[in-house]
């Protein structure tokens, strides 16, 4: 109930509401708008740096996972979204949870929001800023008594599944791509060597042997282009 913090929240939510009304945003889109704002603040962490007040995070335009998650929690709870801080003690990481209808994080009633970078609501952090990944179960710290939930969990789950599938396909194709790259490099080297030989023949006036190599050169180039277009 610090007046300085409340003034900040009123100022920010006032601007967000103007955007919501002018763009005709749904409640889910409004949550995503506020989330994107907090994610856009520069990530910065300092050794032995105590948690900032939300007003400090906004004025500095930066903060670590604790600072940004607490700022987002304050904003969303004041806009009637049911939220909780997700504190990962083992990994020294904090994120935000928002009550949702789908795509819930582990065994919680919240979907995950990563505040340290741009990501969709519901998609957990991959590799943490300091390295490693989230393995432990979070300590859940509810904020406020709001009731509104996020209802686009199924959509973000579909986005996440599509992304994971594309990553898997890329991984499966990687050996084939490397093999093709090696084959093309070998063919390019043969063409380069032949062109060097042909230049030598031309320079020495050996036109007959030069002409004999033209069809060979053209065949190598044709094969290279065919492989390249596959």
Residue ranges and their predicted role:
Residues 1-230:
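A structural boundary/capping signal
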């Amino acid at each position: 109930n610090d007046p300085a913090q409340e003034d900040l929240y009123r100022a920010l939510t006032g601007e967000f509401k103007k955007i919501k009304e002018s763009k005709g945003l749904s409640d889910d889109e409004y949550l995503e708008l506020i989330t994107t704002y907090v994610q856009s603040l520069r990530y910065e962490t300092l050794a032995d740096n105590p948690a900032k007040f939300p007003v400090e995070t906004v004025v500095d335009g930066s903060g670590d996972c604790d600072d940004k998650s607490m700022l987002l929690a304050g904003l969303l709870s004041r806009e009637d979204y049911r939220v909780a801080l997700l504190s990962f003690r083992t990994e020294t990481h904090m994120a935000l949870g928002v009550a949702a209808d789908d795509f819930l994080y582990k065994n919680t009633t919240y979907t995950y929001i990563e505040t340290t970078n741009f990501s969709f609501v519901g998609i957990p952090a991959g590799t943490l800023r300091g390295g490693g990944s989230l393995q432990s179960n979070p300590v859940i710290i509810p904020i406020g008594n709001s009731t509104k939930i996020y209802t686009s969990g199924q959509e973000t789950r579909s986005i996440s599944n599509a992304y994971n599938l594309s990553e898997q396909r890329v991984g499966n194709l990687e050996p084939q791509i490397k093999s093709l790259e090696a084959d093309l490099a070998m063919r390019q080297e043969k063409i380069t060597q032949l062109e060097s030989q042909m230049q030598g023949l031309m320079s020495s006036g050996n036109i007959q042997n030069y002409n004999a190599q033209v069809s060979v050169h053209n065949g190598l180039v044709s094969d290279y282009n065919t492989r390249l277009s596959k």
